[in-house]
């Protein structure tokens, strides 16, 4: 049925007022819910959104939330359906205790507009707690003389629940002698009493067991039970009696446990159990009596159970009770006085006071270290104590008063030898037998800065590869100071000096605390081979002490320089040279020679040459020498060969990784008649300087031969004169010249310069003479020539041991087994003005054999036409013109030859040169001496060609 509302304007106003009133009640009213305690998670409480008149869709937009100051985690609202549910366990007893009412107040807040709703959720009690008695059993003692209807109060039970769940009812198990009476003043205060029905007879039933049960009013009911133990007591009317009220006993201290002190006896006129007596200490007796004595309950015998010490307690007063076994029991009393007699049972006591520790190792004699006092609790001779100190220590005891001593310093201290002393002081009394005690005293010796930091060795050798990153760690120095604490705290610093034009601190730095040495900038082997400096170690004592250590840093070479092509034959990388070759030349004809140098040393400067294949002309009738760089024909040229060839020669060193350079050689094949003209035009501006160089080399060879011959004659004459002359006092004798020979692969000849020095008879002078002979076997390192013998060497003599001045590097030893011929080995180092002759690189000229001996092997990049010499790490400068190096390599020989240089102010003989010839050239020169002029011209031409390559 549908009703239609029709009314006037007043009715509409009344309806609107009612709606506003209802909305106000909803907005400011209060909701009430109830939930049982111990409800599970998710238990439904109420549709709070619906009850508040809120739509589910507006709960989230209006920020519907529950705010509660306490217990906000117990209840939660599901914003999807607006249901209030249990979020966690609710324990009413924990929440409200035993309060009759228990509720959780919630504040529900929504925004837009802001509204606050109050919700009370009542927590209903659940009968989840049974009645509980405080004890599991209650004991009652009832005399057999008690009358019927006697009442004995019992302790009731308690229930943590409230309301009907906590209302308790009691019932007693059926019994003939007892019944239960409950007086209920209210539900919370009930008096439970046990009522005696009839008189008890102990002889019939000495004890009774009953069970009291409490039941609450919950659904279902919960119960609790307690056991009642009723003991019937006998009647007793006579107390035990001792013979005397006080006893006195004397006993020595330290008597053995179990020793009888006294045996007591008491009597009781009662009969049976009421006349049986037991002995015990009175309840008021002191604890120390119980600790030292015990009494037998049946016999009354008192014995010792603890050690008796006269010094602690010399008198004990013991109260004894004799109790019969009647009901109720009756007791008699007496007192036992125990006096303790003294014995020598205490060892002396040692006390150390006023310690003055630690003791400085420079303390004066007589310095007081500590005050020592001794004491003995015994009396008489047992308490007289003498004190002594252990022997062989730098201390002694001085008596200052009775039983007081001073420990003083008796001799000098040295902390570095002994840093601490464990002293033993002995105190002995005068008892018989005598007792003694010891005390230990640790005397620490304070350090004084009397030791400087010391390094493990005075000098260290460090090897660092060049091109190191700035700030890299290269070495760590460590100095040890025998002192302690601040005196042993070592700090490190550089001993500043100049390294060339720069300061040492621009190259390296040292960490003050750790001693780590860092390279501040990349080191260059070509610029600096050896960096020698000192590091200072200084302690923090007052005054500070220090020492220095020397570091020799050898910079090892890395392959950081690519081969450089030399002018004028071949330009730099990308350059080219043109050569005209007649077609009539045969196989093996040298067309051109590519020359290159490498600024590195060792294997990094050992160059090899390769001919790059051309894609346009796969059949190239040319090849390049692997180590000489000479481009020669591989066969006879014919008309089928292309008239122009573009040859790409790859120059590569043997470093890791290898660096390369490329030279371009343009070879034009011409007819035989055109070659001389073109060649003359081409070499007009190029061969001229080389021809001049060839002429100079020829003159040098002639000059060296002449000077060498003259020098040999002079030496022979000088030796003959020295042998015939009588020795004069204070004169100088000629030193033993050392004859050093090269191997059979190559030979050197140079002038021999004899140097005489004025001496005063201290010993034979040393000579600067070293001669090289090409005819000795290669394994003969050196031959000692006698002072009165001629310098001519008998080649038939037995080879002697090598001269220790010769040193073989690892690379040279490997090169001794190489099959590479010297004729194919060549390196030409360019000087500032073009190609110039330099000395061979000898990395092994360093003071230490481990200083990076990386010299190439025989034939490995060391060209007889190009020699490069570098001084050892101790002297990085290059040799000037006319100066002889200290050490160099003999081509074809693994030996490193040492030549003494004249002082800087001496005049160098311009006639002293070293000629680097080849094996074939030596043979040709011998033929030249025989008068073969044709062969002489040919040899000159070959020599000119070889020298021009230099």
From Swiss-Prot:
Keyword Translocase among record annotations: no
One GO cellular component term noted in the UniProt record for this chain: plasma membrane
Domain Cadherin, chain residue ranges per copy: 30-133, 157-242, 243-350, 351-455, 456-565, 581-678
MF terms in GO: calcium ion binding
Cited Pfam families: Cadherin (PF00028), Cadherin_2 (PF08266), Cadherin_tail (PF15974)
Coiled coil: none
SUPFAM superfamilies: Cadherin-like (SSF49313)
Domain of life: Eukaryota
Signal peptide: 1-29
Spans annotated as 5 X 4 AA repeats of P-X-X-P: 774-894
InterPro entries: Cadherin-like_dom, Cadherin-like_sf, Cadherin_CBD, Cadherin_CS, Cadherin_N, Protocadherin/Cadherin-CA
Stretches of the chain found on the membrane's Extracellular side: 30-697
Function: Potential calcium-dependent cell-adhesion protein. May be involved in the establishment and maintenance of specific neuronal connections in the brain.
Record protein name field: Protocadherin alpha-8
Organism: Pan troglodytes
Gene designation: PCDHA8
């Amino acid at each position: 049925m549908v009703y239609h509302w029709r009314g006037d304007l007043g009715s509409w106003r009344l309806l609107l007022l009612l709606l506003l009133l209802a909305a106000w009640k909803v907005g400011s009213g209060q909701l009430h819910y109830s939930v049982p305690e111990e409800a599970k998670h998710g238990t439904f409480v109420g549709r709070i959104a619906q009850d508040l008149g809120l739509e589910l869709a507006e709960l989230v937009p209006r920020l519907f939330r529950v705010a509660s100051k306490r217990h906000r985690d117990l209840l939660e609202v599901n914003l999807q359906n607006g249901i209030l549910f249990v979020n966690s366990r609710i324990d009413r007893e924990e929440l409200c205790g035993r309060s009759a009412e228990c509720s959780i107040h919630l504040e529900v807040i929504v925004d837009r507009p802001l509204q606050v709703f109050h919700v009370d959720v009542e927590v209903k009690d659940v009968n989840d707690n049974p009645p509980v008695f405080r004890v599991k059993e209650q004991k009652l003692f009832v005399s057999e003389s008690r009358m019927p209807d006697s009442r004995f109060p019992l302790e009731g039970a308690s229930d943590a629940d409230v309301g009907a769940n906590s209302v308790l009812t009691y019932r007693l198990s059926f019994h003939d002698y007892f019944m239960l009476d409950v007086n209920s003043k209210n539900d919370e205060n009930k008096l439970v009493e046990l009522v005696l029905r009839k008189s008890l007879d102990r002889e019939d039933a000495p004890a009774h067991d009953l069970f009291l049960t409490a039941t609450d009013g919950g659904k279902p009911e919960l119960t609790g039970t307690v056991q009642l133990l009723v003991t019937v007591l006998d009647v007793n009317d006579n107390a035990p009696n001792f013979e005397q009220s006080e006893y006195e006993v004397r006993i020595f201290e330290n008597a053995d446990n179990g020793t009888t002190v006294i045996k007591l006896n008491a009597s009781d006129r009662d009969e049976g159990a009421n006349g049986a007596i037991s002995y015990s200490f009175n309840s008021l007796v002191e604890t120390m009596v119980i600790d030292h004595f015990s009494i037998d309950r049946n016999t009354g015998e008192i014995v010792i159970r603890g050690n008796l010490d006269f010094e602690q307690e010399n008198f004990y007063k013991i109260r004894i009770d004799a109790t019969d076994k009647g009901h109720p029991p009756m007791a008699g009393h007496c007192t036992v006085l125990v006096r303790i007699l003294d014995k020598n049972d205490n060892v002396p006591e040692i006390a150390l006071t006023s310690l003055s520790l630690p003791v400085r190792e420079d303390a004066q004699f007589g310095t007081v270290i500590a005050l020592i006092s001794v004491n003995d609790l015994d009396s008489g001779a047992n308490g007289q104590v003498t004190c002594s100190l252990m022997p062989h220590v730098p201390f002694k005891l001085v008596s200052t008063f009775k039983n007081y001593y001073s420990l003083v310093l008796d001799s000098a201290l040295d902390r570095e030898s002994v840093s601490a002393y464990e002293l033993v002081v002995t105190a002995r009394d005068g008892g018989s037998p005598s007792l003694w005690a010891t005390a230990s005293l640790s005397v620490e010796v304070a350090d004084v800065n009397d030791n400087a930091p010391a390094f493990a060795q005075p000098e260290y050798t460090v090897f660092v590869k060049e091109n190191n990153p700035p700030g890299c760690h290269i070495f760590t120095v460590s100095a040890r100071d025998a002192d302690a604490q601040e005196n042993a705290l070592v700090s490190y610093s550089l001993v500043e000096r100049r390294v060339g034009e720069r300061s040492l601190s621009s190259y390296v730095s040292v960490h003050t605390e750790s001693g780590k040495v860092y390279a501040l900038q990349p080191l260059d082997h070509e610029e600096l081979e050896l960096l020698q400096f000192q590091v200072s170690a200084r302690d923090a004592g007052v005054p500070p002490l220090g020492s220095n250590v020397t570091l020799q840093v050898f910079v090892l070479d890395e392959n950081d320089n690519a081969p450089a092509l030399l002018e004028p034959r071949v330009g730099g990388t990308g350059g080219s040279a043109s050569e005209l070759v007649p077609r009539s030349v045969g196989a093996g004809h040298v067309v051109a020679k590519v020359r290159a140098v490498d600024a590195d040393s060792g294997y990094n400067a050992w160059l090899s040459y390769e001919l790059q294949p051309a894609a346009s002309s796969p059949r190239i009738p040319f090849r390049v020498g692997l180590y000489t760089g000479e481009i020669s024909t591989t066969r006879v040229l014919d008309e089928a060969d292309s008239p122009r060839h573009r040859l790409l020669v790859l120059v590569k060193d043997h470093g890791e990784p290898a660096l390369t350079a490329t030279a371009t050689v343009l070879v034009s094949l011409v007819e035989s008649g055109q070659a001389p003209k073109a060649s003359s035009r081409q070499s007009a501006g190029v061969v001229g300087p080389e021809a001049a160089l060839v002429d100079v080399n020829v003159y040098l060879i002639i000059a060296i031969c002449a000077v060498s011959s003259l020098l040999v004659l002079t030496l022979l004459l000088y030796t003959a004169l020295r042998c015939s002359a009588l020795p004069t006092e204070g004169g100088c004798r000629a030193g033993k010249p050392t004859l050093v020979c090269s191997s059979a692969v190559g030979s050197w000849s140079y002038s021999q310069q004899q140097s005489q020095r004025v001496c005063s008879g201290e010993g034979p002078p040393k000579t600067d003479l070293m001669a090289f002979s090409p005819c000795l076997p290669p394994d003969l390192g050196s031959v000692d020539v006698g002072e009165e013998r001629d310098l001519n060497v008998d080649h038939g003599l037995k080879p002697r041991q090598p001269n220790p001045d010769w040193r073989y590097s690892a690379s040279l030893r490997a090169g001794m087994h190489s099959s590479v011929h010297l004729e194919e080995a060549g390196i030409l180092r360019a000087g500032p003005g073009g190609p110039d002759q330099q000395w061979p690189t000898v990395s092994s000229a360093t003071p230490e054999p481990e200083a990076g001996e990386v010299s190439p092997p025989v034939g490995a990049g060391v060209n007889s036409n190009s020699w490069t010499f570098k001084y050892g790490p101790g002297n990085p400068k290059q040799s000037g013109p006319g100066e002889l190096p200290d050490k160099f390599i003999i081509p074809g020989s693994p030996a490193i030859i040492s030549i003494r240089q004249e002082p800087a102010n001496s005049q160098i003989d311009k006639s002293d040169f070293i000629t680097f010839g080849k094996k074939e050239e030596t043979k040709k020169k011998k033929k030249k001496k025989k008068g073969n002029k044709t062969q002489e011209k040919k040899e000159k031409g070959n020599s000119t060609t070889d020298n021009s390559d230099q």
